[in-house]
Amino acid sequence: MRTQGELTLPGEELAVIEEFMTGDGTYEQNGIVRAAVVGKIFYDMLNRKSNVLGFKKIIFQHLKKAKYVIGIVNSIKEDSALVSIVGIEERGLASPISAYLHISQISNKKINNVTDAIKIGDVIKAKLLSYTFPLALTIKMKDLGVIYARCSRCGYLLIKQDENNLKCQRCGNIEQRKIGSYMVKKGGN
């Protein structure tokens, strides 16, 4: 019998059928319980079942508990943006998860274009609205929005100037964004 919480790959032996029955993410072959998916082993001692919690399932459990996620804006259309979720709260993800941000979920104020509030390459702090694919995000709340951005003219770091504007310290360019509470301010804070 393998160790609880250990990483397993499909086809690997977990237990014999006399010890544990098959559960989620497992199958039985010639009296041996084997992993059906990549994930962590979980033995249900009460029901005597051998389970494998797939990484997708584990990530979704973390997403449901998360207060916020960190994402990078990949592409923008007229009414939405495609975002790669790269972190759940303060923890980074090994591989990004795709999500989308609809224009109606950007601000409580009317905006005509997604680019009035975010730009490609911006790092945003967002909240999940759905836990099924496609994942939907919102940045409407006061503490959510852009937390890291670069100047569209020279590529230098933008610093928060006021409630809606960011200023480039190199070229002086001023850009408008929906700014989150952790946006870089003058002095690097």
Swiss-Prot record:
Its main location: cytoplasm. One of its GO terms (biological process) is RNA catabolic process. Signal peptide: none annotated. GO terms for cellular component: cytoplasm; exosome (RNase complex). Gene3D superfamilies: 2.20.70.10, 2.40.50.100, Nucleic acid-binding proteins. The keyword Cell cycle does not apply. Zn(2+) binds at C151, C154, C168, C171. GO terms for molecular function: nucleic acid binding; zinc ion binding. Residues 66-142 form the S1 motif domain. Keywords: Cytoplasm, Exosome, Metal-binding, Zinc. It holds the Pfam family ECR1_N. It comes from the Archaea. It is found in: Cytoplasm. Non-catalytic component of the exosome, which is a complex involved in RNA degradation. Increases the RNA binding and the efficiency of RNA degradation. Helpful for the interaction of the exosome with A-poor RNAs. Component of the archaeal exosome complex. Forms a trimer of Rrp4 and/or Csl4 subunits. The trimer associates with a hexameric ring-like arrangement composed of 3 Rrp41-Rrp42 heterodimers. Interacts with DnaG. Belongs to the CSL4 family. This is Exosome complex component Csl4.
